């Protein structure tokens, strides 16, 4: 703890007298004998005195977890910029590429975090998946998502919908379609589950519709899901912010 290697789920260092929160998570930086290098680089899209907007590559986790420590977006950025108080304001899956916003100023962190709590943030994703036969677009898909088996997967259950995704077509390709997806809600794996439920699972998805056997990452087969853009009104200046990934699927 003296080295700041024990942190909460937002990456903030914890002390021995730090209060515990029910349902909270505690992480610690540990040494790994072997950690597979992720052969892709992040790109900084924007930086000011309060936030960083970063274009994350596929396969790179946002936070340290499991078999990943140094090869995470948070640790890479801390080493690059030396920000002691760097914290992601939101996250995307390790398998997903695209825009992630970080706070590096504790004084303004709450202002930016509150945008997500108030649902004042708009996100746009893109996904490459099979073409939906006779699909009529744009369309809206709703369902109730709950924790599945194993615990890291989600499933649809017969209950009042708690998730909603707006889906449209960007372009049709030879055997696939590039979709634009706007999540109205932010449930875990929401887009992946919704497209799988429509019988058009995202290309190279190893979790949906069926859990595939875990093995070493095949860096030539990334999940074809991209957090293309994120936009919000800046809580300090009132200026409209929009950050877009430069990656392609």
What are these regions (language model features)?
Residues 1-249:
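RNA pseudouridine synthases
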């Amino acid at each position: 703890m003296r080295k700041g290697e024990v942190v909460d789920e937002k990456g903030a260092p914890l002390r021995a007298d730090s209060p515990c929160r029910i349902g909270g998570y505690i992480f610690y930086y540990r040494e790994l004998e072997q950690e597979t290098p992720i052969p892709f680089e992040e790109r900084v899209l924007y930086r000011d005195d309060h936030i960083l907007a970063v274009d994350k590559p596929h396969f790179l986790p946002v936070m340290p977890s499991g078999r990943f420590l140094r090869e995470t977006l948070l640790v890479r950025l801390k080493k690059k910029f030396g920000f002691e108080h760097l914290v992601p304001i939101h996250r995307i899956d390790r398998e997903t590429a695209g825009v992630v916003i970080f706070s590096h100023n504790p004084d303004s962190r709450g202002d930016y975090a509150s945008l997500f709590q108030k649902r004042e943030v708009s996100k746009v994703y893109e996904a490459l998946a099979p073409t939906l036969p006779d699909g009529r677009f744009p369309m809206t898909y709703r369902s109730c998502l709950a924790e599945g088996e194993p615990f890291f997967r989600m499933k649809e259950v017969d209950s009042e919908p708690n998730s909603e995704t707006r889906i449209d077509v960007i372009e049709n390709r030879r055997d696939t379609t590039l979709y634009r997806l706007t999540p109205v809600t932010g449930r875990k794996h929401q887009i992946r589950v919704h497209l799988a439920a429509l019988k058009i699972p995202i290309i190279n998805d190893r979790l949906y519709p069926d859990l595939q056997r875990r093995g070493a990452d095949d860096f030539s087969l990334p999940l074809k899901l991209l957090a293309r853009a994120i936009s919000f009104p800046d809580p300090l200046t009132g200026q409209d912010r929009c950050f877009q990934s430069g990656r392609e699927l």
